[in-house]
């Protein structure tokens, strides 16, 4: 997966360099953007506010989905132009489409944690023989978890049982329904959401920290991709998007409360307090 991702990120550098050579102009085109509920889309939500107040360079149709497999067919069929998706999925799609998508930006670094409803897990060794609830089958959470289990001497197919759910909200609901000793892999902000509902839930492992112990590469969780054909046919729209995207991210950093409220309004997170 790392080789695929490296190739994809190199193509991203070439894409940005190519676009930097052109001049941007305001367009009347509506750019179709797909995002997943959760951290990968938080940097995008201020595009909606910018569009509303007239500061966006163009119009955006931002659609949110609960699982990555809902976005994939839309990308392949050309029903969306740009999408925020898990990094490993971007690498897979890049290979399957022979370069039909390219990375525009890294949108999420390490946001994955192992949480427990109890006090029995204090290291990876304590996960042996346990059941782990997780979201993201076939995407970054699965690959990161399995990789780190192996690196810590645990066979993910024999030594643990991993139960996958399509959305992180399903995992948090399952955790809430379990009396004790439930273990899950969750991204932020779902960790905080789960802790708000159950104060006994605690973070036992920061998977970014664990990754850094065994890898010399940065853990990239999510990226924003564009269809290559769209980038070639609509360079002005792509340049404008990149500029608006940067403004949206800056707005998120400068106005956390306002962005949190917007995230709740559009469904990126359940509650702004998260």
Regions found by a protein language model. Give the residues of each.
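An acidic, carboxylate-rich microenvironment
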Residues: 70, 126, 170, 258, ...
């Amino acid at each position: 997966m790392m080789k695929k991702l490296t190739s994809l990120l190199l193509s991203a550098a070439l894409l940005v360099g190519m676009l930097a050579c052109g001049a941007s102009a305001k367009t009347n085109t509506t750019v179709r953007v797909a995002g997943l509920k959760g951290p990968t889309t938080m940097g995008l939500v201020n595009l909606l506010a910018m569009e509303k107040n007239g500061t966006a360079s163009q119009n955006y149709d931002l659609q949110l989905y609960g699982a990555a497999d809902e976005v994939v067919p839309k990308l392949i069929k050309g029903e969306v132009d740009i999408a925020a998706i898990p990094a490993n999925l971007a690498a897979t799609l890049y290979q399957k489409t022979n370069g039909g998508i390219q990375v525009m930006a890294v949108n999420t670094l390490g946001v994955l944690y192992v949480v427990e409803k109890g006090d029995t897990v204090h290291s990876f060794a304590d996960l042996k023989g346990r059941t782990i609830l997780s979201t993201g089958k076939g995407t970054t959470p699965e690959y990161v978890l399995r990789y780190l289990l192996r690196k810590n001497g645990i066979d993910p197919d024999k030594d643990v049982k991993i139960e996958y759910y399509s959305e992180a909200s399903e995992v948090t609901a399952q955790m809430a329904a379990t009396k004790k000793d439930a273990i899950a892999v969750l991204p932020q902000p779902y960790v905080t959401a789960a802790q708000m509902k159950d104060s006994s839930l605690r973070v036992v492992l920061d998977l970014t920290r664990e990754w850094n112990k065994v890898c010399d590469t940065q853990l990239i969780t999510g990226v924003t991709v564009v269809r290559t054909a769209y980038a070639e046919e609509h360079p002005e729209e792509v340049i404008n998007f990149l500029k608006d995207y940067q403004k949206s991210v800056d707005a998120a950093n400068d106005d956390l409360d306002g962005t949190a409220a917007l995230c709740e309004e559009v469904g990126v997170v359940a509650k702004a307090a998260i």
